[in-house]
Curated annotation (Swiss-Prot):
An example Gene Ontology CC term for this record: plasma membrane
Annotated localization: Cell inner membrane
Source organism (scientific name): Saccharophagus degradans (strain 2-40 / ATCC 43961 / DSM 17024)
Assembly mode: F-type ATPases have 2 components, F(1) - the catalytic core - and F(0) - the membrane proton channel. F(1) has five subunits: alpha(3), beta(3), gamma(1), delta(1), epsilon(1). F(0) has three main subunits: a(1), b(2) and c(10-14). The alpha and beta chains form an alternating ring which encloses part of the gamma chain. F(1) is attached to F(0) by a central stalk formed by the gamma and epsilon chains, while a peripheral stalk is formed by the delta and b chains.
Annotated protein name in UniProt: ATP synthase subunit delta
Keyword presence, NADP: no
């Protein structure tokens, strides 16, 4: 997985730069998400791995499957990926592109897991506090996990803040085993 991310990074960056320069981050994000979904269909994977087809034929077939979702520059991007045998990287390219897009827009998706349902007022306070701390516009999603026992587990990008009772007990158990 890390290898795929490393290979996908320059393509995601190139797509991001093209989208930013065209002021079309949303359109590119949608197109890449569609292409990533199409690339994960088993029959499509079979066609893309067929040794008898040229890169041009694979790209043309892939673009045809995506239909009207891809603009001309996005179709050209698919052809570049096919020429370099990188169509299988589309899911990683899409994820990385969305990370670049979120960074550009100064937004961040945050997931908060709690042992109990949190009310709207608490959710609003949490969004305000996280927005201020992270200097980003925060989009919050919540989940209930009774195994946490209490407290909260916050995931913001690659940052994890474990303020749960389960996390504290795990740290205590680890300290006692030392």
């Amino acid at each position: 997985m890390a290898e795929f991310t490393t290979l996908a990074r320059p393509y995601a960056k190139a797509a991001f730069i093209a989208a930013r320069d065209a002021s079309d981050l949303g359109g590119w994000s949608k197109a890449l998400a569609t292409a990533a979904a199409v690339s994960q269909v088993d029959r499509v994977k079979t066609v893309l791995s067929a040794p008898g087809l040229t890169a041009q034929q694979k790209a043309d077939a892939f673009v045809a499957l995506c239909g009207e979702e891809l603009a001309e520059k996005q179709q050209n991007f698919i052809h570049v990926l096919a020429d370099n045998r990188r169509l299988a990287l589309l899911p990683e390219i899409s994820v990385l592109f969305d990370l670049y897009k979120a960074n550009q827009e100064k937004s961040l998706d945050v997931t908060v897991e709690t042992a109990f349902e949190i009310d709207a007022a608490t959710e609003k306070k949490l969004v305000e506090a996280l927005s201020k701390k992270l200097d980003r516009e925060v989009t919050l999603s919540t989940a209930v996990d009774k195994a946490l026992l209490g407290g909260a587990l916050i995931r913001a990008g690659d940052t994890v803040i474990d303020g749960s009772v389960r996390g504290r007990l795990a740290k205590l158990a680890e300290a006692m085993n030392v």
